[in-house]
Curated annotation (Swiss-Prot):
Active-site annotation: 145 (s-palmitoyl cysteine intermediate)
Key word Lipoprotein present: yes
GO cellular component assignments: endoplasmic reticulum; Golgi apparatus; membrane
Key words of the record: Acyltransferase, Glycoprotein, Lipoprotein, Membrane, Palmitate, Transferase, Transmembrane, Transmembrane helix
Lineage: Eukaryota, Amoebozoa, Evosea, Eumycetozoa, Dictyostelia
Residues of this chain annotated as glycosylated in UniProt: 207, 216, 274, 346, 362, 373, 381, 387, 393, 420
Record family assignment: Belongs to the DHHC palmitoyltransferase family.
Annotated spans, Disordered: 262-330, 365-434
EC code: 2.3.1.225
Location of this chain's protein in the cell: Membrane
Protein name: Putative ZDHHC-type palmitoyltransferase 1
PROSITE patterns in the cross-refs: DHHC
Amino acid sequence: MSRPSYASATKTYFHNRLVTGPDRAYFIVAMILMLIPEIPFLIFVCPLFEEWITAAIYPVSIYFWIASYIFLIQTAYTDPGIIPRGIYNDDIFAPDHRQPLFKKITVKDTKQEIKWCETCCLYRPPRANHCGICNNCVERFDHHCPWVGNCIGRRNYQTFLYFLYSLGFLCIWIMGFCVAHICIESARYRDNHPSASSAKVFQEGMNKSHYISDYNYSLWVSRFNSNPYRKSAFANFIEAFCPPRYPSFYKYTLDHEKELTTIPTPNNINGNNNNSINNNNNNNNNNNNNNNNNNNNNNNNNNINNGNSGGTTNNGYTPPISPPQMLQRQSSTIRYSLDNLRTSSNSSLGNFNNLKSSRDLNLSTISEDKPKNLSNSNNNNNTNNKNTSEDNNHSSGSDFGGDEENNEDDFKSDNDKEINSSSLSLNHELQVNV
């Protein structure tokens, strides 16, 4: 069973119009690194070429420098294409109802597998992936760039390319003028020192040429594999640099997280149903056992107060269930079973008291009927001889008393057996349930 972390690491600003990742330190370092080479270039290098080229070297350099900052900020604070999370349900995490890990779909006559994300509770679309840093599933996930501080996905891939190309052109611009300045200064130095020779720096590039050729060959072989998303070079260029503005679904994710905090828990929603069940059980116990009326009424009032304290929903909506709420629900079921155990124990105690009272009543009736039986026996045995009548009366009385004592002992033994059996069953139920 999965135990997803429901909190997302994504941060939002200005009513969810700006969406960014959690790592802000790298983003600040990237801003500083972009500032360091530009200022010395404008101060020390550009004035040397102003007399040979034109003054346009300043605005061109500043334009690409500012463009790099704009595209960097836009990429860092744009929703990369976060997919809204699914609704959390107990049936999803049950072992018998767990979702399959993979499903096969058909995309342009090509079968592909989509994977179930246990954190977001959804099947990821094709070319989507889960970012472990932001803790979100992102459409067309490319990578998580720490220097930008955000994921690179479907909605900010265009601005990320603009940032890379503007920054790359700015680096080439600065490095080109710096190399030109070095060449000019070295030429002046050679004029003053004819014996000096130029350095040779091409050995490292030749060593890397073998790796580059092998990598290009592997790309050439892999491009002929089956890919349902493969397009022409022009179509790929248009899709990368001039894509449509895709909608953002992150607001639905925020609304879903808001519902998780405002809607009451399932324990409180199902409180009325549990109370009705308890009331029916208590009413049945009241009809059977008159001695437990006060206890059952107190239990009913406590259950009703506990059910109405949390609030209920009128529209019958079942909210998402997070793992802490699942534990609350399990605890509520345990409480419900304990309440049923208490009611059953009370009913068994009532039966025990009833058996005891019935035994006492039977013993009292036997003791009252004893003199009556003796008088009847004396009246029926009329004889002429008083001695024989008295002996007969004594003998009959002794016999009757012995029989009566035997009956009383048998009745006591039977009642004691029933009481002992009921007490043993009650103790057995309490030990098992506890």
